[in-house]
A protein has these predicted regions:
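Acidic/polar low-complexity surface segments
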Residues: 70, 74, 80-94, 126
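Solvent-exposed loop/turn tips at the surfaces of repeat/solenoid architectures
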Residues: 30, 35, 40, 53, ...
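Surface-exposed loop/turn motifs in large extracellular/passenger domains
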Residues: 44-51, 67, 80, 92-106
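N-terminal segments that cap or nucleate solenoid repeat domains
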Residues: 2-65
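Arginine residue identity/basic-tract feature
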Residues: 3, 22, 43, 56-57, ...
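Long terminal segments
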Residues: 94-141
Length: 141
């Protein structure tokens, strides 16, 4: 139990360091490449969502929840991301307070760390095919 506690403490220290702001990220930029980004740096005010952005070879660090709709996740890796929420098409657009919403964004060769993913049902099923060990939690109306 003590070793497990030490491991979790070390992980937290590491993630805090990696996610600290060493450079200024402009959340209004259209393209991000080769950046280490604390997910909170991408949050926009008043429930606005990120739209039509491209992320290439970025490391996106939580803790955070990211809803990715109408986008693309290609050749990306997920570390300590836990379960994935799958949104049924019958729900329509959901208002997810505290969640960073990405609409029509592309994530190419990125690393997600400590980030909960919320995906449309089709995207979640594709993710499950590529990563069978992933647990998908379905959200329906």
């Amino acid at each position: 139990m003590y070793r497990w506690s030490q491991l979790n403490s070390s992980k937290k220290t590491y993630y805090d360091y990696m996610g600290s702001s060493r450079s200024t990220i402009n959340p209004l930029s259209e393209n991000f490449a080769d950046e280490i980004i604390n997910m909170e740096q991408l949050r926009l005010p008043a429930l606005q969502h990120q739209e039509n952005k491209t992320f290439r070879r970025c490391i996106l660090i939580g803790p955070s929840a990211a809803a990715i709709f109408d986008g693309e996740i290609r050749d990306s890796v997920f570390f300590d991301c836990g379960d994935v929420f799958s949104m049924s098409p019958t729900i329509g657009m959901a208002y997810l307070n505290g969640t960073i919403v990405f609409k029509n964004c592309r994530f190419i060769d990125c690393k997600f760390i400590n980030t909960t993913l919320i995906l449309p049902e089709v995207a979640a099923n594709l993710l499950k095919q590529n990563m069978p060990e992933t647990k998908i939690l379905k959200v329906t109306r």
